[in-house]
Amino acid sequence: MKHLQDIVKTLHAPHVEGNTAVEILDVTADSRAVKAGSLFIALDGATVDGHDYVNKAVEAGAVAVLVSKPVEVNSDVCVITVEDTRAAMMSCVPNFFDYPANSMRMIGVTGTNGKTTTTHMIRHILKAQGHKVGVIGTVHIMIGDTSYPIHNTTPDVVDLQHILHQMVEEGVTHCVMEVSSHALALGRVTGVEYDTAVFTNLTQDHLDFHKTFENYLAAKCKLFEQVSKPNQVKSGKGAVINIDDAYGHRVVEKTTAPIITYSIDGSGTLNAHDVDMTPKSSRYTVSYDGHDYTVAMNTTGLFNVYNTLAAIGACLLEGISMEDIDKALKTFSAVPGRFELIEEGQPFAVVVDYAHTPDGLENILQTAKAIQANRIIVVFGCGGDRDATKRPIMGRIAAQYGDVVYVTSDNPRTEDPVQIVKDVEVGVKDGLREGTHYEVIVDRREAIQHAIQHAKPGDIVLIAGKGHEDYQILKDKTIHFDDREEARAALKEI
């Protein structure tokens, strides 16, 4: 709870009409979430203008409104006018919640792929040390052991600050957070002071939003510039960077904080080598500070070796010993929808994975090739209203690695699913090897059933793109759809 006058002080050149001595009990930009004592922030969005809902907010109990254009208010509530309500929101909302990030250790993980698994590994290690940990990411929000649903990888400013405040109230000491390029570019994490920044990798994605790869890289680098800023509230900053990635050196240049680089090529300060993998596990040696440690994991894939190194680096910066990290990792289990094995007693492997980028798809296919002697059967599609340039690239990758490829729908959203499939098919035809078979089955359920029905002993069926998601977004509705459920149902029919 704060007085409006305290919030107004954070704004640039506000024009105030009304009483600023009122108490503010909540802040929101969603008129549907307004309650008595709220400050309503009117945002002019791409499809909806919050200024049209000012009076609805007042009727619901708002005692003040923040606007950027003239409005007729049917009440004597305080009206604060600024040039840009979105920019104002980024400064006043963290202030309202008393900058909760300053009361926790904040670990931000950014990169195209690997964010979710890395954040969960970090959480697992921290929890093993007795810390109460919060997680914000693609799969869910976690406060201690309680899970809550999430709609964006990184929530908007209001939701994020509310979540962080709740974490502090519930005694969370460490928050591990996936930080998306959208959030960094749009300022959603303004007011969050990170202690450790982790870079996993950078490959093609989100070019529909960022337009160029340089813009995409620049957005990611904002996190590392932030941990380098002088005169921050908290001390003990650090960065963990994948130096094997083509852009790792560029990220290194963006921070002056202490850095741990990681590698499997031997070029990092933290290195993995002698990697041995099975379909369900991996074992390798990690070298750090002149010592070697044998790491045994219940996860597989070279990409997970990288994820583990990122998590190790972050926890080393948190002061946890390599011995304690190693001990905790032995009990880590795979994250839902991340190379998740579906087992119903069948004589072949079925894996569900979230891979929805060219690099992500190639990673899981390379893993399948390394651990499976027989055929690789791929079921995948590409999302609508997203970066269309990656569709033929992913099609080509699927055809280059897969022995049988089923091109299907993902989340078509407002686009025609048939056209999306055609875009993917261009790449599939380009990458076809001799003996490779591909088929278009637009209905995702049918594609999964077909792939499983035609699998032979020793094959591996990779169902890629949706992972943990339990929905499918169509043009006019969102339906329940879970690749794992569909795979199990199909397996029970064979």
Set out the residue ranges of the language-model regions.
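ATP-dependent carboxylate-amine ligase
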Residues: 1-15, 36-39, 313-323, 327-337, ...
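Phosphate-binding loop of NTP-binding sites
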Residues: 89-241, 249-255, 309, 371-372
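Acidic, Mg2+-coordinating active-site environments of NTP-dependent enzymes
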Residues: 71-75, 196-350, 428, 432-434, ...
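Short secondary-structure boundary segments
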Residues: 67-70, 179, 201, 243, ...
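Active-site regions of enzymes building and remodeling cell-envelope glycoconjugates
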Residues: 75-83, 148-151, 256-261
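Short internal beta-strands
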Residues: 63-69, 239-243, 379-380, 404-410
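N-terminal leader/targeting and accessory segments in enzymes
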Residues: 1-91, 95, 246, 268, ...
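Well-ordered beta-strand positions
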Residues: 39, 64, 196, 238, ...
